């Protein structure tokens, strides 16, 4: 039997900013009520003071299904069990409707999910506003006037109606024929994912607090210098339009301030004002440092562990995402800064950081030091090497490349590195004659051309300083393709099999043995690609449509995509299918490794892309033993050559113990002196003084369209054209347009500015809305290692 349930709560803590685990354990968090239904029975309600329902008194008789089980599990464990005497529910007796939907590539949000499944459940906008008012009750100190009991009773009635509807919607979506139960291997992964998220990983609180302090000082100093340099026109590093206008007024034509555009402009020897403006922008815009505040908020006050950091199936195809603390965005230490700089940052020794370059840039490179082991333990981090290059060669039987990986793994000889082997095949040279720049050529070609990409993919992968013409890049792409005939054929086989499956409705075996089996099938609605592991990737609403690029080309495959919380048509070509299959296989290798580590009694506390992190007592196991467990191939991948690397220590950060700082650009030294004037405590200019909390009118008047845009605060699912379903009237189609500084519904006519939305829709008080806008840290492109 199955129990479907939904809990409605209240707290002074923000669920979005602190996460379910911190939220549930906070003493101000409580329960209004919860609703539940057994199988197809009528929905019932429990309120504080009621006895424990009989069905909850013996939970092992049921499977408990909630929409987002992380929340219900946390509230049940921290509040229902501890305060109201409910017995614990074993994890084996729980399931998640949202995770099942994500596993089949349907939306996470229950309202949009029901719409995509054709179910007649819609969110009541008035009930949502009631929920927001009741979920963050004002304290007596903050309340400006007495609470109206009649309004509260009306809101509770609306919230109860919403809760009843949510239980019905969860039940209907969970049992939709389009959302089949997970296969046993994936059910095991789901349960392990819950255990790993509940275990969490320890946050390095002193390091995070030091990062936050540095960020505030540096950004305030940079903003002060910008203000002085622009004579008060630019007051913040986040004022992108003003910075571009100032640069373009001096003879340039910048359309963006991304890394590539800034580097290109600086390379053309601009005047000193432009150079300093852009250097200041670079200096202050480091997203990794801005994560310090977020990670501190998600860390448990009792043991400093960050729980609930990952969501299985949160990224395609079936991979994990980190939607709350965003731990997957912590940068690698590519600059190889020494570990001693972590201690320097914690000690506030900014002079030592400055010896190595821009302090914010240095701190960003060290950001993986934000995660650490608990006392007496170490973190052992193992990483599958070049896995997205190995898998295509294995799937397609590109034998020379499979052999190259095996030889490299056997010898460890860097001269035989597969990127060098690729360059040798491209350039038709002996591998021992490949120089370092040519090795980089092989790497760039591998990462850009491996999934059928061309010039555009090369530009995204290659370094900013790459100045090759499109013709040169095309020549390199052709050389890569000529060197990989089997992989090239595999692209076409995948796409052709998908088209045949859609046309005929018959399952198609992409390749016969000894190649790994891949089966593509179409059930009249969804296209599925079953990987060698037995797990399927789903493309809902698949159909063939005319080729949009070549009139005489093969038809495109159109499907519905749930990326970024939306549900909109997307197109797939052979590159898309190949990338999904390769990343899906890589995901399944990682998933199998997680189960092996747990079976060996080695607790996984974090994993990211192709990397696994375990936390063990010091001296309990060697790093090579851990690496050997990672490299054990599952039964379905016995012929896949696997290699990897390992490092260990108290910190997640991989860094040499010591090192010598690089030479500093004289211009950077001059800039340091200018900024240090302000860091040392020089009186800031009046226009740069931080606006005090509560000075609402002055603050709001200072906001431009590029500062704290409303789109960054909207929690409702947004369409590709910036619209959401209006929260003020019942309309299944998105009709409310979100702009940078205001919003307007073209259905009912409701409209307003940022503050209106935050207070009327997001449920914030005026003070909370002002604080959220002031705390906004800017939309900066998050830089990730391209091999990830």
Please report, for each region that a protein language model flagged, where it lies by residue.
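Conserved "right-hand" nucleotidyltransferase catalytic core of DNA-directed polymerases
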Residues: 1-15, 26, 116, 130-366, ...
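A common structural junction motif
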Residues: 466, 629-638
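Active-site palm subdomain of RNA-directed nucleic acid polymerases
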Residues: 177-189, 589-612
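Short beta-strand
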Residues: 235-237, 603-608, 717-719, 736-737
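N-terminal structured subdomain of primase-like DNA metabolism proteins
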Residues: 676-788
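Short beta-strand-to-loop capping motifs
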Residues: 614-618
